[in-house]
Amino acid sequence: GLTISEKMRKQIKGLDRASTNAEDGVSAVQTAEGALTEVHSMLQRMNELATQSANGTNSNTDRKAIQDEIDQLTTEIDRVSETTKFNETYLLKGDGAEKAHNVNAHDAGLDGVTLTDKGNEVEVTLKTLNAGDKVSIAGKNYTIGGVTADVTKMLGADGANIDTNHDDVTVNGTIYKWYDAIAADTTGAGYKGTEAGWYSKDPATLDNKTKSTSPEYKNAAAFAAVKGATISVGSKSVTTIDDTKADGIDDNDSTVITARKAYQLQTAEIVKASSIGTDTAATVKANAGNTNADYATATTTFTLNKGTVSYKDSLSFNLHVGADADMTNKITVNIDSMNSAGLGVKGIKADTEQDATYAIDAIADAISTVSSQRSSLGAVQNRLEHTINNLDNVVENTTSAESRIRDTDMAEEMVNYSKNNILAQAGQSMLAQANQSNQGVLSLLQ
């Protein structure tokens, strides 16, 4: 009985302590959750301010005042993260050394843009634009023109004696030729346009060949992005292509641009919107058909390297809620770094209309991050409440069992005591009666 009762006592005391551990865990979780409630409130205020700043009725002075408050709020978010602690354990500042973490990409509010997350990268698909389409980019309205580049008329050249009529190009209702004349050359009977690479600064030329082939204008759009690019036909003619001339033609409060130019502008804005809150900005991934630095190919699909920001990894601690050393008695609590870097709003700006517009998405992500963390903490707290109830139940019943072995059964003993007491009193009564009878006989004899 002693061995069994001591084993039970060990379990009872361990479970009592485990229940207290769980209660301490609830207190720690409630401390973190309460701090995040204030972080949530500050982010909601920042969202309100960014939305206000994005409105065109605000002056630069107004936006500066808005930016001042946003700066104060981000500073306070960092302070809360750095100082919130329970029993000398900091709860919201993460743990370990700082590491680079990815920041979510954003679509810059562009219509029809699809972002497909692929870990460190995002596949971006832009809406295909056709002639006559209206598109809004960075708060400006554009109309897509009918070709991919503006082409000026071929300049006539002295000595040109072969008239041509190849690859007509229509720009804003005017028909242009790729080239109008080629000089005769006694060394060859043919011609072919040499294709220039994307963003080539060297002119494309027509070289004499032994076989006549049709010229191609594949890279017109790439030339379009380079002001002053030329195409020479032998040494007799020059064509200039300058897409910048398309940017500035008003058409019903819109600017006529090429589809490729629109893709370039959209790409640049997506990069800008996806770089908010980063230490290292997002970039377009360089590959065989996708130039990183200047978005030269600017097609409807490209890959974006996510921007990164440095902050500490999640804080993780275990609550031991059992009497045994079994690892299943551990409940793990994870709390992410909740400073401005971890929330993706580090250094966020809303002092221009466009920056404020992009800030709205970044703040929305931060709010979602805090909501997710609070939800996780709430789930842990609810679990701990059930754990405490179960532990208390086990303690109560184990204590009862141990008591039956180790302790006196007071009810049974009281029954026995009462019975024995009654019997003793009855015996005394009978003896007294017997003594009285003897006295009566003696009295008669006298």
Regions found by a protein language model. Give the residues of each.
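Primary detection of the long, small/polar-rich alpha-helical "axial" segments characteristic
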Residues: 1-173, 185-188, 193-194, 201-446
